[in-house]
């Protein structure tokens, strides 16, 4: 068994950190049940492997950039210096709605551990593994992905929409299609992502691939267990085609002629202030691509049953971009 004495831990930590950044003695944690007690400069020992905690991860959704996620620890592997994201057990339940449909949701560490095994080696997913702590909590140890999340990446493209759509969007669509194929791979393996949203895609700065993170949610619905993932994919596509959210209130103020042509049926089925029928706003969007978006509009009468159908239409839309 590895020597994990205080002296040995300090020697390991000094390979990666300045002495002034380290405590005189480390507090060692082998039971993560109370994740609030796992704090900065604690050493997590999991499966006889030491990780130095460097802080809590933060929630970046909807601009909440400093909302800590106390069950997710930014850490360093003391044996090789690599950055890790260590996810501790946090249980919660809630309901979500997509139009008239209600989904029941739970957060499941076991499910995420299972999915990590399924996607091992897949370039469009975060990579990691699970271990049990001394109280048999399922802890997930994730390789840190260097890059920015998808909203940050898109907001960094400083072009007007037409220039963005014809210049940047074709390559973005290609990368996005790879993420849809990745979700299709999950579904073929009878798994779901469970929390498909744009800030759960990281643009890997090394490979430029779009990579999925955070798949510890399970959504239940008696008709289609994959439906929530598909709705999330549609919301991301609408966001990418628009080069950001196209908000009705903003159109009312800035483009009143366009706003007056919009109806309730043109709006996003989940976010009722966002336009899904983007061809009414940007007429150069192809009919083929816009027809995909309309599957996620309030006026739709047909939903995608599976990611295979969605992929087929996306590939046709990609071809329509090349033709124009």
Segments from the language model and where they lie:
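Activation segment signature within eukaryotic-like protein kinase domains
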Residues: 175-176
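Structural motif in protein kinase domains
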Residues: 145-160
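Juxta-kinase regulatory segment immediately upstream of eukaryotic protein kinase catalytic domains
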Residues: 2-63
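Short beta-strand micro-motifs within the conserved protein kinase catalytic domain, predominantly
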Residues: 127-138
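A conserved short helix/loop substructure at the end of the activation segment
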Residues: 297-309
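ATP-binding glycine-rich loop module of kinase domains
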Residues: 55, 59-117
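Catalytic-loop of the protein kinase fold
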Residues: 183-198, 203
């Amino acid at each position: 068994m590895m020597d994990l004495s205080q002296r040995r831990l300090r020697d390991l930590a000094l390979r990666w950190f300045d002495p002034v950044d380290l405590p005189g003695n480390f507090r060692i944690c082998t039971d993560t049940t109370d994740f609030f007690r796992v704090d900065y400069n604690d050493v997590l020992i999991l499966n006889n492997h030491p990780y130095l905690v460097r802080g809590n991860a933060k929630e970046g959704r909807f601009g909440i950039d400093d909302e800590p996620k106390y069950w997710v620890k930014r850490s360093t592997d003391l044996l090789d210096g690599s950055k890790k994201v260590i996810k501790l057990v946090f249980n919660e339940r809630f309901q979500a709605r997509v139009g008239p449909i209600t989904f029941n949701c739970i957060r499941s560490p076991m499910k995420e551990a299972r999915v990590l095994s399924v996607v091992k080696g897949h370039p469009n997913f975060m990579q990691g593994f699970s271990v049990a702590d001394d109280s048999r909590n399922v802890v997930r140890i994730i390789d840190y992905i260097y890059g920015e999340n998808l909203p940050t990446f898109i907001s960094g493209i400083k072009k007007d929409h037409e220039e963005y759509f014809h210049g940047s969007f074709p390559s973005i669509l290609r990368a996005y299609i790879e993420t849809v194929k990745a979700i299709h791979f999950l579904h073929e393996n009878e798994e779901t992502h469970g929390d498909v949203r744009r800030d759960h895609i990281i643009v890997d700065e090394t490979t430029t691939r779009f990579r999925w993170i955070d798949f510890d949610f399970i959504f239940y619905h008696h008709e289609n267990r994959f439906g929530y993932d598909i709705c999330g994919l549609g919301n991301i596509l609408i966001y990418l085609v628009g080069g950001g959210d196209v908000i009705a209130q903003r159109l009312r103020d800035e483009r009143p002629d366009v706003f007056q042509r919009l109806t309730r049926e043109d709006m996003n089925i989940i976010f009722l202030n966002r336009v899904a029928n983007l061809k009414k706003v940007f007429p150069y969007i192809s009919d083929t691509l816009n027809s995909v978006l309309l599957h996620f509009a309030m006026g739709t009468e047909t939903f995608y049953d599976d990611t295979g159908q969605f992929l087929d239409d996306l590939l046709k839309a990609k071809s329509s971009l090349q033709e124009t």
